[in-house]
Amino acid sequence: MGKYFGTDGVRGVANKELTPELAFKIGRFGGYVLTKDTDRPKVIIGRDTRVSGHMLEGALVAGLLSTGAEVMRLGVISTPGVAYLTKALDAQAGVMISASHNPVQDNGIKFFGSDGFKLTDEQEAEIEALLDKEVDELPRPTGTNLGQVSDYFEGGQKYLQYIKQTVEEDFSGLHIALDCAHGATSSLAPYLFADLEADISTMGTSPNGMNINEGVGSTHPEVLAELVKEKGADIGLAFDGDGDRLIAVDEKGNIVDGDQIMFICAKYMKETGQLKHNTVVSTVMSNLGFYKALEANNITSDKTAVGDRYVMEEMKRGGYNLGGEQSGHIILLDYITTGDGMLSALQLVNIMKMTKKPLSELAGEMTKFPQLLVNVRVTDKKLALENEKIKEIIRVVEEEMNGDGRILVRPSGTEPLIRVMAEAPTQEVCDAFVHRIVEVVKAEVGAE
């Protein structure tokens, strides 16, 4: 991670850390780095439903136009929609304005290259070097060489038509409950599933600029679970603010997380000869039960650091086509170049249709170990990881576990948090281990 770029682009409190002035520079320098070898380059921009999206979009557009780029605004669209359209529309770069599952005051800017993939560390470092220069020495075209802006609000429909083709039959006869987090999928997902002839119930589809992720979406699936039970739905599908995550709910109201969705997809893809190299790529946060279920089905796993960019890097390196995170980022690389909540949802419902099994049965083939994750707000993430007392309590707890479970303590990639996670044979043991570590972290580096 650099000074500006975290694990998922540039993030911060809009108009405080992520200011219009910074957004202008990111547009100008980012646009230059990604398009400098092209005459009259095309850059597309999408955003989620945050109130700050218009402000940052205007600044970004100005920065891009100042380099001579032609800018196409997509309006409100999901992150994977931008990734797909960057390549499909032959753009030199794509930009998404979103802070994903974060609260409304936050926002972020992430770039995609012409291939639809997120930027490499080297590209981000090149942009950061320009941001840190005292004098802007980039070319400043004038007159007819300046860029122009246009709108392509039909882009969302083009993207939906593409992902719709990935399923084998329609969803008639199924009742699907959708939670769109008052975010980027609010107008897209209901249209998609209705178009596939499903009976749908919806929530989180009334964005007002202020309510994105507020008590809804993939970080609050328990709310969708109530709707599933109330409506008697066959499945619930919860997306996050920018539509790159999926958390599901089975017909009984049980939450089905990213690990379980990955396992269901892996098993089906193996059975149908689609799973490349018989391997799934996951992160260190995946549940022990996930690995045991894969092992029982003779499927190999490959483990990375936390963050969908690291999963993607490993997938590209090894030629794998399925990967993801417990949080619901599922990457289906045969179809799209980033985590995609709606695409993952289509595949999950398609598997239900093709196997004629309810989601509870499909998910039930994986038994999760009890797990607890506690976020501790800290003054300094780096200091926390170097603190001797914190290192000592982790060592003591790991010794006591004696291999029957695991502890993971790591910094958040986007917030001033230390995440403390444990898995153990019982919830009681799990909770006790986590709280012992949390108390030491709070005492040593906790923020008020």
From Swiss-Prot:
GO molecular function per UniProt: magnesium ion binding; phosphoglucosamine mutase activity; phosphomannomutase activity
Keyword Phosphoprotein: yes
One protein family per Pfam: PGM_PMM_II
Note on cofactor: Binds 1 Mg(2+) ion per subunit.
Cofactor(s) needed: Mg(2+)
Chain positions with Phosphoserine modification: 100
Active-site residue numbers: 100 (phosphoserine intermediate)
A GO BP entry: carbohydrate metabolic process
Entry comment on modification after translation: Activated by phosphorylation.
GO terms for cellular component: cytosol
Catalytic activity: alpha-D-glucosamine 1-phosphate = D-glucosamine 6-phosphate
Enzyme class: isomerase
Transmembrane segments: none
EC number: 5.4.2.10
Binding site for Mg(2+): 100, 240, 242, 244
Keywords, in A-Z order: Isomerase, Magnesium, Metal-binding, Phosphoprotein
Described purpose of this protein according to its UniProt entry: Catalyzes the conversion of glucosamine-6-phosphate to glucosamine-1-phosphate.
UniProt cross-references to HAMAP family, sorted A to Z: GlmM_B (MF_01554_B)
Family: Belongs to the phosphohexose mutase family.
Protein's name according to its UniProt entry: Phosphoglucosamine mutase
Gene that specifies this protein: glmM
